[in-house]
Regions:
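Kelch-like beta-propeller repeat domains
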Residues: 15-365
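Bacterial N-terminal signal peptides that target proteins for export
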Residues: 1-7
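Bacterial N-terminal signal peptides
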Residues: 7-17
Length: 365
């Protein structure tokens, strides 16, 4: 009888605690520390290669201390090793895996401004080679692989514009050349660019003269930009991800107050209606996020950076869930890369003092 009463009391206490915290976040997956990179990096790029390894390129140790170096993460051994160096040290560049298996690295900051230079990494040789230059200098631009294998590059900052620019161009993978195309309706830096199911690209938010609530669609058939519905909240340095039903999640970022205007709000874009609607909020306000939220299990998107907590958006419940475990600090401009086995590599970033970390973590669903 005594054992029964103890068990009953334990159950009652548990129910009372649950009732007292009805909004306590559920846990989804776990974050654990992993082997460090060879160099501390932030604002670098991380690209999953066809062989399952991850190319980490460029970035910075601290302000004005930029890298040419690159390294490879092997998910089998869990370790990093060196590979060929880029021709130009750069930070805030774009990196896109091409259908050929090569990686296009374009633009970025080079210390005294931005660059229009571009190079290709060949995993079979481990070397970077310079390719044709972009038509415009740009740093912190967006780059999206189109259905035809070409790459759309939009916005970013150049030497002369304090905010973003509105120019755009296409990298033709076959000829390895860049072509200037029509301008966006709004200048943007630190926007998101998401490929939709129908082949169009949603470009949302970013900063021009001010932080944008506007969004537009790029149509590869006409090579034109078309305005669409506006975000509910103007934001930049946010993240975005495609959901299984074809809608797009937009989350976090900041308003014009930057560090003091970090956002926890999220919204969803519906290509059928061309409108944004409010979604559940993140548990933590965060900005300076990876542009693309990492897809994990069907209907789930991982959001890391800007907080010690890692969150998962669950499209079935429409809520953000908190993973167990934490990263070591509030790292900004870190990377998150989905691996072939369903895990996600989280790497680098910098805290408030601008000194990057070499730390990495693995998210296990």
């Amino acid at each position: 009888m005594t054992l029964f009463r103890f068990a009953l009391a334990f159950l009652v206490l548990g129910l009372v605690a649950l009732a007292a915290h009805p909004d306590r976040p559920s846990q989804a997956g776990r974050v654990t520390p992993a082997a460090p990179m060879l160099e501390p990096r932030s604002s670098h790029s991380a690209t999953l290669l066809p062989n399952g390894q991850v190319l980490i390129a460029g970035g910075m140790r601290r302000n004005q201390d930029f890298y040419r170096s690159a390294e490879l993460y092997d998910p089998v051994t869990g370790k990093f090793r060196t590979t060929g160096a880029m021709n130009i040290a750069r930070v805030g560049h774009t990196a896109v895996l091409l259908r050929s298996g090569k990686v296009l690295i374009a633009g970025g900051w080079i210390g005294h401004g931005t660059t229009n230079s571009a190079e290709l990494y060949d995993p079979t040789t481990g070397k970077f080679t310079l390719t044709a230059a972009m038509t415009h200098r740009r740093g912190h631009a967006s780059a999206t692989l189109l259905d035809n294998g070409d790459v759309l590059i939009t916005g970013g900052a150049d030497h002369d514009t304090p905010g973003g620019i509105n120019s755009a161009e296409i990298f033709h993978a076959g000829s390895q050349t860049f072509e200037a195309i029509g301008t966006m309706h709004d200048a943007r830096i630190a926007q998101t660019s998401t490929l939709l199911r129908d082949g169009r690209v949603l470009i949302a938010g970013g900063r021009g003269d001010s932080v944008n609530a506007s969004a537009e669609l790029y149509d590869p058939k006409t090579k034109r930009f078309i305005p669409t519905g506006s975000l509910l909240t103007a934001r930049y340095k946010h993240t975005a991800g495609l959901l299984p039903d074809g809608r797009v999640l937009i989350a976090g970022g900041s308003d014009a107050r930057d560090w003091h205007g970090q956002l926890s709000s999220a919204e969803i874009y519906d290509p059928q209606t061309g409108r944004f609607t409010a979604a559940a909020s993140l548990h933590d306000a965060r900005f300076k996020l990876p542009e693309d939220a990492a897809p994990i299990r069907p209907g789930e998107l991982l959001i890391a950076g800007g907080s010690k907590q890692v969150e998962v958006y669950d499209a079935r419940s429409g809520k953000f869930l908190v993973a167990s475990g934490q990263i070591s600090d509030v790292w900004h401009f870190m990377t998150e890369t989905p691996l072939r086995d369903g895990r996600v590599l989280l790497a680098g970033g910098y805290p408030d003092d601008d000194h990057a970390t070499a730390d990495t973590w693995i998210y296990q669903p």
